[in-house]
Design a protein with these regions (language model features):
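Charge-dense, helix-prone N-terminal extensions
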Residues: 1-121
Length: 121
């Protein structure tokens, strides 16, 4: 489904999906206030430069999965070596909503990826 705004996207989510998305947005706003939240490809994203090709991190949620999207396939492959039981796409890592540990792991990996790309924290 395609959404035209972040508020429209968030209002379409169920409780758990909304919780995870809002937690991630809060994390990014508090730890990386210089990165501007964008709504692109029907998901919240933070670009590391003026254009998406400069690198990005984003998140999306479905009824069964929360997904971290990054601009590096090699970074996703590195995560896969560490946690092969998670679900992987070309530039994304997905978790179910079953454990808090998995969400905290994705938060950690997002922080690491952002820090590598913007040189902070």
């Amino acid at each position: 489904m395609s959404f035209s705004s972040l508020s429209e996207y968030i209002s379409s989510l169920g409780d758990k999906e909304k919780e995870y998305i809002l937690r991630f947005i809060k994390l990014m706003e508090s730890e990386y206030p210089k990165l501007k939240l964008r709504f692109s490809f029907s998901m919240p994203m933070w670009w590391f430069g003026e254009k998406m090709k400069d690198g990005y991190v984003g998140v999306s949620a479905t009824k069964s999965r929360f997904t971290l999207h990054v601009s590096s396939e090699s970074y996703v492959r590195d995560i896969e070596k560490e946690r092969p039981e998670l679900k992987y796409g070309k530039q994304c890592v997905s978790i179910s909503y079953k454990t808090e540990e998995d969400f905290l792991f994705l938060e950690k990996k997002a922080r690491e990826f952002v820090s590598i790309n913007i040189g902070e924290k």
